[in-house]
Amino acid sequence: MKLGRATLALLLLVPCVVRAVEPISLGLALAGVLTGYISYPRLYCLFAECCGQKRSLSREALQKDLDNKLFGQHLAKRVILNAVSGFLSNPKPKKPLTLSLHGWTGTGKNFASKIIAENIYEGGLNSDYVHLFVATLHFPHASNITLYKDQLQMWIRGNVSACARSIFIFDEMDKMHAGLIDAIKPFLDYYDVVDEVSYQKAIFIFLSNAGAERITDVALDFWRSGKQREEIKLRDMEHALAVSVFNNKNSGFWHSSLIDRNLIDYFVPFLPLEYKHLKMCIRVEMQSRGYEEDEDIINKVAEEMTFFPKEEKVFSDKGCKTVFTKLDYYLDD
């Protein structure tokens, strides 16, 4: 809650006061308005962000955002749509929703978490109820892991106490110190209450490059077999992805109890992007900047990117991550 914004809204509700009104009368009137204002959450939420959904999550709106903004990720789109909409429609979930998004840089993991946040809170990632942790920024020193565990537990407990529908996003899980993330295990388990706080309506999203090699191997096998990437099913890689991440010493999930105790609801693979997907990213970026689509520029930017494997050159090295800066060069030309 932003007190200044709420107070300003209150003052707007109070009629202009003529000079004849005594200060005490004005104070009583304002107190009455305050009492009534606070008594009606719906009225309050017209002027300040509230915990929970300001509006009911629209499955159709979420699907539209995923279809229009996330390219080449049929598996991720399906899992996110069903998992998030299903979880939010359940009035009494047994545990928090936990999604672990895996794939190379630039494939859309951060963008997907942004879409989820924006469809739950109007403020999106800037909402008071959405919390982003970046491993290299917030947990840089291995020697402080005990301190980080205590701080992480306190932060999550405090924020869920204030808002049951809090969203926590952990970026760079592949760079997080092993064992640190296990500090939040009690909050993800099947407990109704932990230290007088219920975490069952919270959402935890983990982003990682770990397991990207396994995802690429499956995608490349399908390509070499002449199959469409859309034929890849979640069952083709989810279990192998979980095992790969669990056994990866460079992953924050290395031998993690979150995986061992099956507390991650979905391991979501983000496939490496092909040339056609880069063109989609460039086209949408041009539209968002107010430019007309220019196929010549779109092709030039896409051709600037590098691809792998070295022989076949099927997948983009950096996904869509750097196409935006490449686009700047051609738009200014």
Swiss-Prot record:
Keyword Hydrolase: yes
One record GO biological process: cell adhesion
Membrane topology field: Peripheral membrane protein
PTM annotation: N-glycosylated.
Location of the protein in the cell: Endoplasmic reticulum lumen; Nucleus inner membrane; Cell projection, Growth cone; Cytoplasmic vesicle membrane
Keyword set, alphabetical order: Cell projection, Cytoplasmic vesicle, Endoplasmic reticulum, Glycoprotein, Hydrolase, Membrane, Nucleus, Signal, Synapse
Tissue: Expressed in brain (at protein level).
InterPro entries per the UniProt record, alphabetical: P-loop_NTPase, TOR1A_C, Torsin, Torsin_1/2
Region Interaction with KLC1: start-end pairs: 252-333
Catalyzed reactions per annotation: ATP + H2O = ADP + phosphate + H(+)
Region (Interaction with SYNE3): 313-333
Gene Ontology CC annotations of this record: cytoplasm; cytoplasmic vesicle membrane; endoplasmic reticulum; endoplasmic reticulum lumen; endoplasmic reticulum membrane; growth cone; membrane; nuclear envelope
Region described as Interaction with SNAPIN: spans on this chain: 92-252
Pfam families: TOR1A_C (PF21376), Torsin (PF06309)
Enzyme category, top tier: hydrolase
Record function comment: Protein with chaperone functions important for the control of protein folding, processing, stability and localization as well as for the reduction of misfolded protein aggregates. Involved in the regulation of synaptic vesicle recycling, controls STON2 protein stability in collaboration with the COP9 signalosome complex (CSN). In the nucleus, may link the cytoskeleton with the nuclear envelope, this mechanism seems to be crucial for the control of nuclear polarity, cell movement and, specifically in neurons, nuclear envelope integrity.
Family: Belongs to the ClpA/ClpB family. Torsin subfamily.
Protein name: Torsin-1A
Taxonomic source organism: Rattus norvegicus (Rat)
